[in-house]
Amino acid sequence: MKSKKNKSKKTSNALTISGIILLVLITVIYYLFFTGMSKNGEEKYIYIDNDDTADSVYYKIKPIATAHSAWALQQVGTILAYNENVRSGRYAIGNEGALQTLRNLRNGRQAPIHLTIRSVRTLDDIADDASKKMSFSKKDFMNAVINPDTCAKYGYTPETIMCMFIPNTYDFYWNTGIGEFLQKMKKESDKFWTPERKDKAEAAELTPEQVMTIASIIAEETNNKDEKPTIAGIYINRLKINMPLQSCPTVKFAMKRFDLKRLYTSMLSYDSPYNTYKYKGLPPGPIRNPNIEDIDAVLNYRHHKYIYMCAKADFSGTHDFAETYEEHSANSKRYDEELNKRGIK
């Protein structure tokens, strides 16, 4: 009887010890392979190039991961032959464990980049923004957008290609090539130009590129949202009667003098197809990348008889509008007098 009790006790102790060992083993495995890899729980990223190896990837991960998870990742990588499946891209090292992170790396499950296309003055500015976040260089971008054949592929010229970059935030993979990048921007541009927007452009007897060119001028003329449709109406009125647009921002763009606070008569004869004082019609393309608000202001322009505008002499950022040259001259005189009074040159 005593022997049976001792045997039962030994069995019970053995089971308890086995259970403890199993629990410890499970805890260790979970700790090594399933707890978040990043230090302090903060998600960080690694960038894997085409020439990276498994060892160089481990080296990149080590500074941003906990020591135990970096070790565990390397062990799993060895077992699953990660050295044969290294894929370039941008990957998150965050709350996922070593096992799932290794799966992401092997299968190319990248963390997307949120790239914001801003309303900026030049393609060079867009190239700066894009190349800071993407794997392609600024040179790659500029070589593409100034190439007539590349532009023609998407239905543009080097002067109008900016129209393809509608200001918004887009998701990309870091290692997206410049060709694929441009294809996506074209797709997003086509999506932006809905049948409703196209119909409005057609009703105004404008192409989408012409709409965006006018919108770019408006964006430089004012930040006042309420005035934008009125100013759009002025330029459309001028186009209809074949009157020069005479837009000061186009002269600044032509001269690449964006710092000018005042234009003088001598500047208005600057020879450039972008100078709308010297040449009738629209400039060859946008003078900046207009916001959606500016584009929609043109599509929903106000119908009126104004053909003149002048900044108000109170420097409120708004404008005086006029139907006749006499009215405009009076408005312009007040503004010039105030410029002189304030010593603005």
Residue ranges of model-derived segments:
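Hydrophobic membrane-insertion alpha-helices, especially the h-region
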Residues: 17-30
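Signal peptide-directed extracytoplasmic domains
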Residues: 35-192
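N-terminal Lys/Arg-rich, disordered targeting/topogenic segments
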Residues: 1-11
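Hydrophobic alpha-helical targeting segments used for export or membrane insertion
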Residues: 27-34, 210-213
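Bacterial extracytoplasmic/cell-wall-associated proteins, especially those involved in peptidoglycan
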Residues: 128, 134-139, 147-345
